[in-house]
């Protein structure tokens, strides 16, 4: 009886071992997961920055484009399951233009993360649309910076 139990336990261990080995393996597209995290952080910085109505309009455009970029990345099944409003802890930046500059910095980093070589034609299209939305968000945030500098 002990021999049967040991054999059964050994067989079960051998059956489960491959799954345990894959548990710590990084995902197929870790750069996209980093991009999702950075997009959420940029979104938070834009949405939690008090500003003038003209600047806020540009921030709204940037936030909308960030949401669209997140949607494109998630359509590619590169979804970490987090809520769009979930973001990594962000060091509080008190000056109003500081958050805009940090958001632009993050968006440029995201562009680099997402713009990597892609083999799957379906995913290429999603990647290209995500990049378009990221670039639009970057331009809107840059316009918001210009509005702050020009006192608009």
Predicted regions and their residues:
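Bacterial N-terminal signal peptides
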Residues: 10-18
């Amino acid at each position: 009886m002990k021999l049967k139990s040991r054999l059964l336990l050994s067989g079960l261990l051998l059956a489960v071992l491959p799954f345990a080995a894959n548990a710590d393996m990084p995902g197929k597209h870790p750069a996209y997961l980093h991009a999702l995290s950075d997009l959420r952080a940029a979104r938070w910085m834009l949405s939690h920055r008090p500003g003038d109505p003209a600047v806020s309009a540009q921030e709204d455009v940037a936030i909308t484009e960030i949401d669209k970029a997140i949607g494109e990345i998630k359509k590619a099944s590169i979804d970490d399951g987090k809520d769009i409003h979930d973001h990594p802890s962000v060091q509080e930046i008190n000056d109003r233009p500081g958050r805009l500059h940090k958001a632009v910095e993050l968006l440029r980093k995201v562009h680099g993360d997402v713009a990597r070589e892609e083999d799957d034609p379906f995913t290429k299209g999603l990647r290209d649309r995500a990049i378009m939305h990221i670039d639009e968000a970057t331009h809107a945030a840059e316009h918001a910076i210009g509005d702050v500098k020009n006192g608009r």
